[in-house]
Every structure is written in structure tokens, then in C-alpha cells.
Amino acid sequence: MFLTGCVSSLSAQQSFWKEDFSAGKLPDGWMIVDSTKSAKCEWIVTDQPYPGSFQFEQQAPPIASTSRGYHMQFRPGVVTGEEITKWNQREEYPNGYFQTSAIDCAGKNDVVLKFQHLFRWNNWFTGKRAGLWVGVSNDGVNWKEYNVMDKIPAATQLHAPVNEEINISEVAANQKTVYLRFFWRDIFSWYWMVDDIELTEPFAHDLALEKVTSHQETGNTFTKEDVLKVKLKNVGSQPVDEDFTVTASLNNGQKLTATVTASGHPIAKQEEYEVAFPATDLTQMGSYKIEFAIQYPKDERSSNNILKANLFAARMNLGKLTKF
């Protein structure tokens, strides 16, 4: 992690609250709420894989979070099984959440919630409020909620954890009692794993690369004029109002560069921005390893400036064979 010589930046990055579930049990004062009527469907603390269920027979390994081991896991797919249609006819969803005890954020002018999670969801008969919702409250009654499904398509099997960073200052800044809630809502299956929940104060200048938006990891159809796109986010406490570049280094030797003209259109705090690279020919190989990198001199944290991705074609066209 890159740290500047500025004392205020150094102190601003320190975590002031964290839970990694290494004790192997629900922390004192936390609660688990199951709103189903027909069967128990509760969050659990576990270090075990998702055991598999209808239409997803294989196990999903435990989340490969930074701390590894114990994590929070919700597995509605095991409960609904092959009975999703019947659950839908009853207009009942396997909804459930876990909630922290009160967290002291007094004296914190900016608060960022960070956590790692892994999930797979089924879009059969989803409800109007369907989503993976993270709620923040300073009274335990009124909640500001964020849907953290990150536009991941239904049935996508993620392998690497998704790193979430949400600026929750609107609710949490300078509050003595702050509660966090992780709520699976109006989806019948399959699972959600959460680990390494943390509250920090943000850097002033901090851009983060989040994910590739132009391609999935597998099943791609590469073209001669392919446009790679990647999403970044301003997770700092200040707007970004200077131009910077983002590079994409491919394992075939290509290096693409895109310029973000933030001087004309500043990127506000918590704003996301999609970077598009110049079109390139990706038909020559069936898979690619790509390293994306932000080049922004003011950035005070380098650990989130790099994103490594693997892209695989659905099939590879070998062209016309002239000899065998």
C-alpha cells in the first residue's frame, strides 16, 4: 500500500472498526433475522462451502477473502431447492438479514464501508425489491440501503470476491451509534457470502478500479474491433478534476491507453466512471490476461489502482486448414 508523507493522509486511511469472524461465532450484540414462514433460512457463521442445490449441484467454495476461513453465509437455494414454483405461488421469499451492534463513528467526518463478498443469484420469479441490500442506520429504525449486486447477471458464478467500498458519510459521519445490515431480499436462490467488514476514513484522493464491464470472464465472442471497458470509482473524499490515464496491458504484447478528461467533467465523490479503450483485434487468441492500471499522480493509495482480469472465448475459430 502506498502511503504519502502527509500525516493527515496517513491517519485518514486507518481502519477504526473491523470484523473478520475469525472467532467462528456471531459477534456479541449482533442479530440474525429470518422472515420466512415455511422453513428456516438463516445467515450462519461458517468456514464451509455452499453445499449445492437445485440447478447448481456442485459446491461453491468458501469465499477467498483476505482473512479466509469463517465468514457470514446465506444459502436460500438449499431451502427452496426444487420448490421455487411453490414458494412463488405462496408469494413467500426466503428473505433474511444479519445486523451489527452499534458502532461508534463519533468524530469521523467521512466514513467508508468496505467488505468482500461472493454471490450467485437466480432471476426466477424475483420480487419488486429483489437485491442484495446493505443498509446503514444511525437509529436502528430508518435505513439507507445500497444494492450491491453490481449488475452481475443472473446465474453468474463468481470466483474472486467482489471488493465493495461505499461512502456512508450521509448516515454515519459523526454519529455515536451506527448499525450495518446485510439483507437478502426477494430472490429464491442461490447464496451470498460476506467477510472482512470494515469502516475507515477515506483518503482525499483515491481512485479504484472495480471490474471489466465490456466482457464476462467466460463465453466471450472476440472481434476485430473489440472495445475493452472497465469501471472505476472515486472512493476518495474529494472530487477528481484533473485529467489522468488508464492503461490495459494484454498478454499478447498490446498496451492500450485511455485518457479520462476529468478537467472538463470532474468525477464526484462516490461517482462511478466507465473507461473505454481504443478498439483492438482480439480474434487472434482464445484467452487473454489483462492488467488494467490507473495513472493518477495525486492518488494516495496504489493497492486499488490495478485490476487483473482473465477473458476466455466461448470458442476459438482456427480458420482454414491448408495442411494436416
Language model region names:
Residues T100, G135-S137, S249:
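Conserved Ser/Thr-centered positions that define the repeating blades of beta-propeller domains
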Residues F21, F98-S101, C105-N122, L132, ...:
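Extracellular beta-strand-rich recognition modules
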